[in-house]
């Protein structure tokens, strides 16, 4: 079992039914693991829309709304919906992609410290490095 499969199992155990978001190179392992899950991926055209859908799902159901994005600019598009969810007390989880800097031929291209950016707008922000 790889890290993505373990993460999907944890989401299933928490009762997650839907994930709103956009596929990208940096979250393909996660999406592959999602293929065998009962959790449904709701594709969106923009990360901000995915964030608002997840926040509103949380508001209406009381269950955690989960949204998914790629790295860098895709992840920063969650900022407004993160603030909206926090101010409204809506349960929401944001999952963003990231790539290892060492393996990237492009260096820091599109790599943003999303954890530090989201801390003021969320209850908890963490990057998973090792499983």
Spans of features found by a protein language model:
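N-terminal alpha/beta PP-like core and its mobile active-site loop of ThDP/TPP-dependent enzymes
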Residues: 1-131
